[in-house]
């Protein structure tokens, strides 16, 4: 059920270069109509599941974070650049949402180089400073590496344990990271789709930041919002 079925049978745009030639159907034929009907039915099922999921989320209670602390101010004041008005407004709105007693679901949009990472960093700091864990989900290992080192540098003056979970880590390192997430030893983790694996267990996850959310698809990201 759900998005997987849609992908298996949905009508797709043909892209050349595939090893197998596409099967041709007559537009007026019964087989083409059946294919479209299956795709529509699968989409309807997935849409219902998604609506049920969002309704369930609305009934969930979330953790209400405390107001900004002196430590939060120190972290934000350590930013070496002048913030833009949009950065300041977005960061404040996100932090105010985190202080409400229900799960936050926010979309932050901005062009490359406009400071989205710093806005996310301030939310991540607010989370881990209160003893919760935070995760940053990214679509590629290159982005994971980039965000990991950026956040390591940004948090270097504060006593938080930051790790990265991707193919850049050996099997032994990944095992230790998984153990650290479950025990609470790791405060902040940056990872690829591995973070969506069923074997991942957090001791006290308080915030999930998804970079380039559109590259993960609706279904996996929507279900992670329940964590």
Spell out what each predicted region is.
Residues 171-188:
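Conserved motor-coupling elements within RecA-like helicase/translocase cores
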Residues 25-114, 118-129, 133-135:
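Pre-Walker A segment
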Residues 133-150:
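Conserved Walker A/P-loop ATP-binding site and its immediately adjacent core
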Residues 2-10, 224-227:
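Conserved small/polar residues in nucleotide/adenosyl-binding loops
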Residues 145-170:
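Conserved helix-turn-beta segment of the N-terminal RecA-like "Helicase ATP-binding" lobe
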Residues 201-226:
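SF2 helicase catalytic motif II
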Residues 8-11, 17-23, 37-38, 62:
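N-terminal cationic and glycine-rich segments that engage phosphates or anionic surfaces
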Residues 164-174, 192-195:
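Conserved helicase motor
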């Amino acid at each position: 059920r759900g998005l997987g079925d849609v992908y298996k049978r949905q009508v797709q745009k043909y892209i050349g270069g595939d090893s197998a030639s596409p099967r041709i159907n007559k537009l007026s034929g019964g087989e083409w109509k059946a294919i479209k009907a299956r795709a529509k039915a699968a989409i309807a099922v997935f849409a219902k599941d998604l609506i049920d999921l969002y309704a369930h989320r609305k009934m969930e209670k979330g953790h209400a974070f405390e107001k900004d602390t002196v430590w939060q101010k120190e972290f934000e004041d350590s930013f070496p650049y002048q913030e833009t008005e949009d950065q300041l407004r977005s960061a404040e709105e996100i932090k105010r949402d985190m202080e409400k007693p229900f799960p936050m679901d926010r979309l932050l949009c901005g062009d490359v180089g406009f400071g989205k990472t710093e806005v996310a960093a301030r939310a991540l700091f607010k989370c881990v400073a209160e003893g919760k864990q935070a995760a940053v989900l990214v679509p590629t290992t290159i982005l994971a590496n980039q965000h990991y080192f950026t956040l390591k540098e940004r948090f270097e003056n504060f006593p938080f344990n930051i790790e990265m979970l991707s193919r850049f880590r050996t099997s032994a390192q990944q095992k230790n990271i998984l153990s650290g997430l479950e025990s609470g030893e790791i405060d902040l983790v940056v990872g690829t789709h591995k973070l969506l694996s069923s074997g991942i267990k957090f001791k006290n996850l308080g915030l999930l930041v998804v970079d380039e959310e559109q590259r993960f698809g609706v279904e996996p990201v929507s279900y992670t919002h329940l964590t």
